[in-house]
């Protein structure tokens, strides 16, 4: 497998995210979304000989890049798993409750988006796939070919926040009865015609494609599972930094952290005797939500929607 796919990726909030982890030279850290290794390389540069870094990714190309890095640096290990499974991985390695910091950089990477053969983009024609790991799960084409119109509309609306979801789903089903969808450009054209009110400066297929990608990869389900697993994996004083790129992701992260800041009392029945510690917060927030600087926005326009939230485990 070729390590350098020819598509560049500029790591978003690179310095800010690594700084947020408050690295210890001998700490054990976890990069839940290795990608092309931007964050991981910077973390490794700040760790001492006893420091360790464990990387996760589903994408075979990312794994190839990670394996090359692991061959260069014995402090680093890469595993081909979703960060939703980090709990099982750290348990197998005897690291549960011992991880010093965890970073999650959510969403699709530039190499995935820019490579037409991955099928993520409506701008460049390619096979309608959209899977982070092309060897697992069903492709976007398979979903579109078999799902009922109501399910397609739900995906467009719930995950893409597309207000014309029903109309676009009906257009998709009407067309697939004549000819199946196999290419991204083909689907994008049908969605374009079915969208009566394009947003200025935005491709009419944008939201529907986002919805499909999130559904095919179970991105929100993985995020919810990954956040819970991350909290259990962290040691007391360990930090969790999460970078999200759209409101659905950020809402999940924000609500998760808000719940833990309040403690567990809100989830208990009224008038039930409880120990005092359930009223105590499990985490504390580190600063406010962070966004890309003006300089980063100019250098990398894709960073405009990035928001990072950071928390520290208290108990």
UniProtKB/Swiss-Prot annotation:
Domain of life: Bacteria
EC number, as in UniProt: 2.1.1.199
Reactions the enzyme catalyzes: cytidine(1402) in 16S rRNA + S-adenosyl-L-methionine = N(4)-methylcytidine(1402) in 16S rRNA + S-adenosyl-L-homocysteine + H(+)
KW DNA repair (keyword) present: no
GO biological process per UniProt: rRNA base methylation
EC main group: transferase
Pfam families: Methyltransf_5
Predominant place of localization: cytoplasm
Signal peptide: none
Cellular component, GO, one term: cytoplasm
Chain residues that bind S-adenosyl-L-methionine: 37-39, 57, 83, 105, 112
Keywords: Cytoplasm, Methyltransferase, rRNA processing, S-adenosyl-L-methionine, Transferase
GO function terms (MF aspect): rRNA (cytosine-N4-)-methyltransferase activity
InterPro entries: RsmH, SAM-dep_MeTrfase_MraW_recog, SAM-dependent_MTases_sf
SUPFAM superfamilies (UniProt xref): Putative methyltransferase TM0872, insert domain, S-adenosyl-L-methionine-dependent methyltransferases
Cell compartment(s), UniProt: Cytoplasm
Family affiliation: Belongs to the methyltransferase superfamily. RsmH family.
UniProt cross-references to PANTHER family, sorted A to Z: 12S RRNA N4-METHYLCYTIDINE METHYLTRANSFERASE, S-ADENOSYL-METHYLTRANSFERASE MRAW
The protein's role, per its UniProt record: Specifically methylates the N4 position of cytidine in position 1402 (C1402) of 16S rRNA.
Name recorded for this polypeptide: Ribosomal RNA small subunit methyltransferase H
Source organism: Pseudomonas putida (strain W619)
